[in-house]
Amino acid sequence: MTESQRIGQLFNVGLENDRLDAASRKAIIGDHFGSVWFRAKTTIGVAGVRKVADAVQALATDATDGVDFFVAANQEGGLIQALAGPGFSTIPSAVDQGKLDPSVLEGRAARWGQQLIDAGVNLDFAPVADVVPKGTEAQNAPIGQLRREYGSDPVAVGKHVVAFIRGMTKVGVATTAKHFPGLGRVEGNTDFTSAVVDTVTTAHDPYREPFARAVSAGVPFVMISLATYDRIDPDHLAAFSTKVIHGVLRRDIGFGGVVMSDSLTADAVSEIAPGQRAIDFIDAGGDMIVLGPIAVAVPMADALAKRAASNAAFRARIDHSALRILEAKDAAGLLPCSG
């Protein structure tokens, strides 16, 4: 792979609505972006999504040196279900999933995962591992208000998180534990506001239990939140924090997989130049940059290339992150040599 192709592997870019348009096709080929996601809800069903996913995979020869794409979606359930229509089940919210016995949830997750596989989707931005304290749901905009949490007890939530991961893994869907180190005790939603601050969570917080269980279960991706955690690193958003990524997630919990950003086109980071967002995330130890409009990825990729050209240590970070992503793709059978 060339340096630009390795940089491209670091990006998971949003598709426009439910299609692969000409501008997206051009950007994916030109900047070698290695993963995509359905960022808008669609009701075109399994067959319609499969048509789009197949069109993306057909770009691999020209875009990514023959390496297939992670094709992703937010398929949590409840209000957060991107893919619907013929062939897709209506997935209950995590609150309702949390009422199921974990063994039952595992079976249902396998069924939902098979629908994703049939649609050509091989990566789910789920499960949510955030814990919302009982009685605070209405004040918790990103998770509790939307019924995205499995519950209020970290141990019980962890069991359901693992069940979801195991069910999806059985049928070949990679999963993402999110939003580390937790959005269950904030009020603002980082998608729509900046300066979201958690004043409670600590580096050894009991509410990190679901993430630790997910890591022990082999989850390949962990998504980092865009909130600030005053008691871990008050000076940086979590996605830009070495203390959060290296100190807590990698060193303390032992995660060796792909660290994924929450969307770096969210309002929480809107005041930071796109290129700087990408640099700060990789500098902090992140691997895969998730973002919405694909046009924003172009200046991000340019910024990474310029920094790598003048900084050997940063270039090594890029190469290490690209390797982690390629290892995840190998595990998912997406490399030409995957057995």
Segments (PLM) and residue ranges:
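Second-shell residues forming the walls of enzyme active-site clefts
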Residues: T2, A47-Q57, V155-A309, A313
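Preference for extracellular/luminal or secreted protein segments
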Residues: M1-G30, Q81, E271-G339
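Short acidic, glycine-rich surface-loop motifs adjacent to enzyme active sites
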Residues: A27-V46, F125, N140, V215-D235
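Glycine-rich anion/phosphate-binding loops
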Residues: G98-R111, V155-G158, H204
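Glycine-rich, aromatic-flanked loop segments that form ligand/cofactor-binding clefts
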Residues: L59-F88, R108-G135, V157-P181
